[in-house]
Amino acid sequence: MKMLRKTLCAMTLGAATLAPVMSTTVFAAPVAASEQQATNNLVKQLSNIRTLSANFEQTTKATSAGKAPQKKGLTGQHMNQTFKGVMKVARPGKFFWETTSPAKQTIVTSGKTVWIYDPDLQQAVRQSLDEQVANTPALLLSGNTSQIMKSYRVTQPDKGKTYYTLYPKVKDSAFQSLTISFGANKAPSLMILQDSLGQTTYVRFNNVKLNPSIASSTFNFTPPKGTDIIDQ
């Protein structure tokens, strides 16, 4: 279970869309947006989000049963396990991500410090929200939109549809590509992340509420008494 928790944290912070489902009926060839257009369109899409709340389902799958899991010390069964929970976002920089099943874990930041809390292990990791952490997929929805061009190369395969694929510009990034798709309500509906180990992480959002009222205390964290605090 401890390894599962470490994997969940890695998927969420350092590694965290489903590839958009495309119709097999072809009416016309899609016209891709230029990189500048794609970036501008994504920034505009994200700018609609002041606050956001949703339930999520997150599943990671390996392209081969033995390859990636062996490197991570996980079995194929673990790699295909689905995590469920809730997330809340408030711009700028506030993020709450709580997994409720099968292992409970909370990741929260008020914009300066990231806390990763595991109640079963009675352990909390405290990490500074530096530029590297701020550019991870899980914080894309709450981060500074002006940094997108600096951190990612953005593509929009069909400029008539609201899904985008982002490629990190840094060479040592934990993921190779990130696809994010938005629904008719202008809120994110799903994300897919592909990493260098041949693994694909799918995050589906449901019960999405765009710009709801969220208490500021949601993004504050105080470790319970007796919690082992680890600074990174």
Model-derived features with residue positions:
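N-terminal mature ectodomain segment of secretory-pathway/periplasmic proteins
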Residues: 47-111
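Bacterial N-terminal signal peptides that target proteins for export
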Residues: 2-14
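C-terminal segment of classical bacterial N-terminal signal peptides
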Residues: 15-27
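Cleaved targeting-peptide boundary
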Residues: 26-37
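An acidic-aromatic
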Residues: 86-136, 201-202
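Short beta-strands and strand-coil junctions in structured, solvent-facing domains, enriched
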Residues: 63, 96, 103-105, 123, ...
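Short, solvent-exposed helix-to-loop capping segments enriched in aromatics
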Residues: 133-147
